[in-house]
Amino acid sequence: MDWNGNSKINLFINDLNVKIFKTSHDAVDSVGFVFSNNDKEFVYVTDTGYIKNKYFELLTNKDIYVFESNHDVQMLMDNPNYPYQTKQRILSDKGHLSNKDSSFYLSKLIGKKTKHIILAHLSEQNNDK
């Protein structure tokens, strides 16, 4: 995707507005989305190590959130199947949101409009069922 120096892209498909924004991840062109149609808004964010402050306004008080809650930090650190380097990558700003980080961000973002929160990108090995 050609960002032309921008951190957000705005697309329209008929009545659907799609805002695409960069996430902080070690994959090329990792992005999140805000879908809007009339007064309904839906946020989709996975594959990010943190949420940049400049996106808070864009992400605040939406109807639906699908939000990364990848791992429990202690379970990740105690997992013998993950090398230390992998653990450090997952925990980094270019990795994945922990359950604690996800709940922190959601507590700042949700509002009166919010009806649904769906936790996504949950690690099968480093998260409680």
Residue map of PLM features:
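Cap/insert and terminal regions of metallo-dependent hydrolase folds
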Residues: N53-K129
